[in-house]
Amino acid sequence: MNPRPSIAFAKFAAPQTAANRKGTVFVLSADDGGLSDAARAYDPGKTLERAFPVAEFTGKFAGVVEILAPEGTSLDRLVAIGAGKAAGLDEYAWLKLGGTIAASLRKATDVAVVLDLVGASIDGKDAANLAAGILLRSYSFDKYKTSKDKDDAKADPKKPVKITIHTADPAGAKKAFADAEAVIDGVLLARDLVNEPANILGPVEFAARAKELETLGVKVEILTEKEMKKLGMGSLLGVAQGSPRGARMAVMQWNGGKPKDGPIAFVGKGVTFDTGGNSMKPASGMEDMKGDMGGAAAVTGLMHALAARKAKANVVGIIGLVENAVDGHAQRPGDIVTSMSGQTIEVLNTDAEGRLVLADALWYCNDRFQPKFMVNLATLTGAIMVALGLHYAGLFSNNDELAERLAAAGQATQERLWRMPLGAEYDKLIDSKNADMKNIGGRYGGAIIAAQFLQRFVKDTPWAHLDIAGTAMGSPSSEINQSWGSGFGVRLLDRLVRDHYES
């Protein structure tokens, strides 16, 4: 992997210092096409501004124009980034501007960003969000490549990019960035986990990665198959029985709130590879099922983020980790298993396994911790992708307040959610003549039926299910993400905790 950029903050340079600057400089221009005085200091010959009309650069958001070796300077490149409407830049806009800068770095190793804009008041949080956008877009997963592609335009991996962001409030920016960087680290951890191949990251290895959070102050317990069997987790263990790689459950606790406060809880599906079991998936595209642990990755990344920024909340993160493989011991269609709740399940499709894992994980979480609410994340159904495409995750909930708060957090972070229905009409579709329930329903409403199944394991606890099958992996590239594994859910849930549940 290319090393992440090194980011520092400083005051605006004096004109003489700016004129003698070397390397690459980025400046911002609003939609009137004008530069601030701080930006003009790097272009005494006005070479860049003269290029605006020729390049048809108007300051439109994320537009880019650059000059190589501008006259009268020692710079290699001078680059203008369009900021659009100066007065309308929100948190996500600053992230995207940072991503645009990262995409334009090329092989630069010494970079200055002049964070000044005519018509806008830019504070420390804005600067921190721009820096966070740079880190998000700069991420790449190429650790297994032994040589660079010939057309790779990125900098030499042995020379990490040094970026200095010049702003009116460098102290405020530095403080805000420490908080933002903690969250970004959680996102990048989630991306790493989703991107890892399944031969490297199985249930045991994933559990070990979760255990590493102890260095941040997270309490981590790893339940083995023997311990889960003793607890009666027949639903989860049934999925795992076809693989020689043992199942695990990681229980993570961050106690940053008041001792008397009950915890909030997040539960993730962690199927480290999903063949479909005896209900085998088609070979085409099966390689993507290394990412079927995107929910567990998001929960692990969230716990990293909360601990790293010392969130003032008591939070539990639980991930059920299995591999759904096929051998002579694998679960068969028609098998009946007993979940930790005591409810029996007729397994009619072994490729509807994520809900079986979550059933025991949710029950265990609720039974042990009595949380204020539970939110589970899972790459659960292809049906949600048919319904919503790749830009929204499905939101199902038994609690309107929790659903509204999640939707608002999704809008604020642009990790967007769309609420889907639940109801008795759907619930009866999973009734079984041979057991308390079956793990699939009819042909229609597959994402809803999966959510109805999960609801049978949460009692009356406020609960939400996020089906992130379309957003956790293989989602469209954006200004802040070019990775196959997106890390979806970390920023969303951090925002939920930050806005509503910190003491």
Swiss-Prot record:
Pfam families noted in UniProt: Peptidase_M17 (PF00883), Peptidase_M17_N (PF02789)
Compartment(s): Cytoplasm
Catalytic residues as annotated in Swiss-Prot or TrEMBL: K281, R355
Residues annotated to bind Mn(2+) 2: K269, D274, D292, E353
Enzyme category, top tier: hydrolase
Keyword Cytoplasm tagged: yes
Keywords: Aminopeptidase, Cytoplasm, Hydrolase, Manganese, Metal-binding, Protease
Cofactor: Mn(2+)
Cofactor note text: Binds 2 manganese ions per subunit.
Family recorded in the similarity comment: Belongs to the peptidase M17 family.
Function: Presumably involved in the processing and regular turnover of intracellular proteins. Catalyzes the removal of unsubstituted N-terminal amino acids from various peptides.
Protein name, entry field: Probable cytosol aminopeptidase
Species whose genome carries this gene: Mesorhizobium japonicum (strain LMG 29417 / CECT 9101 / MAFF 303099)
Gene name, Swiss-Prot/TrEMBL: pepA
